[in-house]
């Protein structure tokens, strides 16, 4: 049964003490008997009965709560509504949700514009390449995809839109219009009723302006006098606009003209000021000059002439006022004219200054670039001159150093050759074993030389032959020079020496004839300068042949 006066809905239950079931201690011996089974069954039945009773009770409570309020158990929907109200009341969350990007739209537009410009550049590049080809591939078929056709169509539409926008801007822009046709078209549309007449017009604006009340100052001009002044100003403006050469005329005028105009205006002012004072002084002097008797006589006349004098005085005052108004008008017109002229001159001067400044700003970077270029050219020429002078001095110094060293080397080499030839002859004469050993070495060297010749290119072989011939010619010349030098001693010694030489030459010729043609070898002992030089030449020839045969290029070390 439900407890009367119980609340329903979202009610937090109070913490109740949990009832722990009492656990029965097992028996000491641990023997489970039949009595224990019976007790456990009865306990389980009691528990189930208690649960059923509780379920019935809760069902009854639920039914009663629903009967009182149908929305008692709608917890989720109520909670969601509460959260929505919180979010609506919190402005920060609303700003976070409705927040839109500030800059991404402009960036995306800029990206699209750049893409279009890039496509236009690529098309121009392709067009140039086709022009360079000069119709080589006109016979070939051109394959165009549907996407490319679509892109071309879109581009043509965009170009048409841009042209329309440019034409509209040119029509609406006043600076781009050549005549007043656009203005008259607007007037016609307004008259017909296609366009609405603007609310604010010049008349309404003029009527809205309140006229200033005169405050009684002497410098102020009345409203009547203001109208002719405005007319004069308008006339002067029209004259200035009609005369296009007025600017040059104003510039050509000297300071003398300005002084003349100022003197005229000052004279007019002095006349205006002096006229009432002179009239007043003249009237007083006449009164003072009269005697008292005359005053008595004139008193009777004064009444008769009073009306006349008063009328004349009024006329004078009217004339004086008219003169003052005219002078003031002239003064104001002159002043306005001078102001306009000065402002026009000032505008011209400022325009010239701005024009000159603009030209100077444009000329500055050009002059700077020209100076930098001239400095670079001058530096290059100077460096070249310095470099050429240094090279010439270096070459001279090297030549001066090499000349004496070359002379000394030649002398030393010639001496060494002579000594070596002497030693060699003595060895040949004294030792036959040395000759046999040298023959063997020469044979081995000649065989190696032939192998190298076979391996080397035909160019190197031809060079080797030519060098061998030169070497043999030099040897003969050296032998002849030695013979001439040895003929100078006494006749007895010369006769004996001649016989000895003849015998030696005969022996050497026989030996040379006995030697095979391979006797001359590149590996023969290098005992003089000629043989050393020929070996160098052969080595260089072999290197050149190898370089020519190579398919690649080796990097040269500095």
Curated annotation (Swiss-Prot):
One annotated Gene Ontology cellular component of this protein: nuclear speck
Keywords, in A-Z order: Coiled coil, Disease variant, Epilepsy, Intellectual disability, Isopeptide bond, mRNA processing, mRNA splicing, Nucleus, Phosphoprotein, RNA-binding, Ubl conjugation
Coiled coil: 104-170, 379-427
Chain positions covered by the region annotation Necessary for alternative splicing activity: 106-170
Biased composition regions of type Polar residues, renumbered to the chain: 216-226
Pfam families: NRP1_C, NSRP1_N
Biased composition (Basic and acidic residues): 204-215, 250-280, 311-442, 449-487, 501-517
Gene Ontology terms, MF aspect: mRNA binding; RNA binding
Biological process (GO), any one: developmental process
Keyword Coiled coil annotated: yes
Modified residues (Phosphothreonine): 275
The keyword Phosphoprotein is assigned to this record: yes
Organism domain of life: Eukaryota
Principal subcellular localization: nucleus
Placement of covalent cross-link Glycyl lysine isopeptide (Lys-Gly) (interchain with G-Cter in SUMO2): 199, 210, 281
Region entry Disordered, spans: 21-54, 204-534
Family: Belongs to the NSRP1 family.
Entry's disease: Neurodevelopmental disorder with spasticity, seizures, and brain abnormalities: An autosomal recessive disorder characterized by developmental delay apparent in infancy, impaired intellectual development with poor or absent speech, epilepsy, variable microcephaly, hypotonia, and spastic cerebral palsy. Brain abnormalities include simplified gyral pattern, defects of the operculum, and vermian hypoplasia. Death in early childhood may occur.
Function: RNA-binding protein that mediates pre-mRNA alternative splicing regulation.
Protein name: Nuclear speckle splicing regulatory protein 1
Source organism (scientific name): Homo sapiens
Native organism taxonomy: Eukaryota, Metazoa, Chordata, Craniata, Vertebrata
